[in-house]
Swiss-Prot record:
HAMAP family: HisA (MF_01014). Belongs to the HisA/HisF family. The keyword Zinc does not apply. Keywords: Amino-acid biosynthesis, Cytoplasm, Histidine biosynthesis, Isomerase. It is an enzyme of class 5 (isomerase). This is 1-(5-phosphoribosyl)-5-[(5-phosphoribosylamino)methylideneamino] imidazole-4-carboxamide isomerase. InterPro entries: Aldolase_TIM, His_biosynth, HisA_bact_arch, Isoase_HisA-like, Isoase_HisA-like_bact, RibuloseP-bd_barrel.
Length: 245
């Protein structure tokens, strides 16, 4: 079980959105590299980064900020947002990313994801963002008719290192993780699942540490960490205890 602190990048700054709406962005730190260092100093072992502008543009927009983050932290970093081609993937992995997260392209071109997994084993994750049970693409701006589990099953046996599952209806509003849909997905596939969207309090951390959540690889926390609703020291102690159980 891993707790991933999140850095969402918009216009070079560390922000959080409400419900994935770019017009509802709160700036939490104008210096993403400093934020990355702070998370490492707090004891976190990984970092989850999203290029929000890139997700809408279909290509990297906040590259300078990501490079600064990679230089600032010794922790492994996973990046999503605007990564749509093998060239994009190879470029970022050569820059020092631990793994890339493929979202829109996983819907548009599943074969590319499978090819990437073969070329970069263990370094490709799939991001599945859902609204009303259906997969959303293009920075959450478009809905598809594809179901979450239907999409996830396309990558069984392909070598996908993890699925990052985000419930858009809960993202950034501190209402708690959608445990039913998250655990349903985790139990439907053999690929490790990381929960995202809605992590709200220490109660959610305790729920993550419960035995029935053991199938999850971890969870991503953004706003609850920035707002002080989750205490890093206490949360990490609970997560580490769950690993040993």
């Amino acid at each position: 079980m891993i707790l991933f602190p999140a850095i969402d990048l918009k216009d070079g700054q560390c922000v959080r959105l409400k419900l994935g709406d770019m017009d509802q962005a709160t700036v939490y730190n104008p210096d993403p590299a400093a934020q990355a260092r702070a998370f490492e100093e707090q004891g976190f072992e990984w970092l989850h980064v999203v290029d929000l502008n890139g997700a809408f543009a279909g290509e990297t927009v906040n590259g300078a900020a990501v490079d600064a983050i990679l230089k600032a932290t010794g922790n492994p970093v996973q990046l999503g947002g605007g990564i749509r081609t093998l060239e994009h993937i190879e470029n970022w992995l050569s820059h020092g990313l631990a793994r890339v997260i493929l979202g829109t392209v996983a819907v548009r071109d599943p074969a590319l994801v499978i090819e990437a997994c073969g070329k970069f084993p263990g370094r490709v994750a799939v991001g599945i963002d859902a609204k009303g049970g259906k997969v959303a693409v293009e920075g959450w701006a478009e809905a598809s008719e594809l179901g979450v589990i239907e999409l996830a099953k396309k990558f069984e046996g392909a070598g996908v290192s993890a699925i990052i599952y985000t419930d858009i209806d809960r993202d950034g509003i501190l209402t708690g993780i959608n445990w039913d849909s998250t655990l349903e997905l985790a139990n439907a596939v053999s690929i490790p699942v990381i929960a995202s969207g809605g992590l709200a309090s220490m109660d959610d951390i305790r729920r993550l540490a419960a035995p029935d959540a053991a199938k999850l690889e971890g969870a991503i926390s953004g706003r609850a960490l920035y707002d002080g609703r989750i205490d890093p020291k206490e949360a990490l102690a609970l997560i580490r205890a769950a690993r040993k159980a």
